[in-house]
Amino acid sequence: MEHYLSIFIKTIFIENMALSFFLGMCTFLAVSKKVSTAIGLGVAVVVVLGLAVPANQIIYQAILAPGALDSLMGITDPKESIDLSFLSFITFIGVIAALVQILEMLLDKYFPALYQALGIFLPLITVNCAIFGAVSFMVAKNLTLGESVVYGVGSGIGWMLAIVLMAGLREKMKYSDVPNGLKGLGITFITAGLMAFGFLSFGGISL
């Protein structure tokens, strides 16, 4: 249990997708103007990551990993071992795209206001670097199915936390006297950098 809790906390604070690895920054900067919209997109990312990471883990270990199909094909010679890992990227993107399409249809039917607010950025989750990055890290870390579920959900919550914090700060900055040369993306980049420095302080925690 402690092992899974350690993974969960690390993915939220120490290995935050947005503020530690700077993944998914295009959506992070574009949709962080309002807290309500940021929360909606954040929840969508949590759902997609919570499903995409373990789903791709199952597919990778069962089909794509080197030697995964050897027993099924009756191969005993290591020289003839089947390795489909070169199909990982396109397979991962396909799974993510399918999950995003399902989520998009559900939001359109049950939460039309949120669907309209997210606009083009909802289908762009398909190519969100944070989603693909978490799946790639899952393979690199060789996580089990249980670890993948925790890692996916934790990564999503970490990204959601970052975008909601950014949206809250940007809403407050509307009432601030920002220099003309820094208005818009200028002050937003500076704010994101300062937030990243803040999250760096969690790096000293040993889990």
Curated annotation (Swiss-Prot):
GO biological process: one example: sodium ion transport
Pfam families documented for this protein: Rnf-Nqr
Cited InterPro entries: NqrDE/RnfAE, NqrDE/RnfAE_oxidrdctase, NqrE
KW Transferase (keyword) present: no
Domain of life: Bacteria
Catalyzed chemical reaction(s): a ubiquinone + n Na(+)(in) + NADH + H(+) = a ubiquinol + n Na(+)(out) + NAD(+)
Segments traversing the membrane: 11-31, 35-55, 86-106, 120-140, 149-169, 185-205
Major site of localization recorded for this protein: membrane
UniProt topology in membrane: Multi-pass membrane protein
Broad enzyme group: translocase
Signal peptide positions (record): none
Compartment list: Cell inner membrane
Keyword NAD: yes
A GO CC term assigned to this protein in UniProt: plasma membrane
Family, per entry: Belongs to the NqrDE/RnfAE family.
HAMAP family given in the database record: NqrE
Subunit structure: Composed of six subunits; NqrA, NqrB, NqrC, NqrD, NqrE and NqrF.
Protein name (Swiss-Prot/TrEMBL): Na(+)-translocating NADH-quinone reductase subunit E
Provenance organism: Colwellia psychrerythraea (strain 34H / ATCC BAA-681)
Underlying gene: nqrE
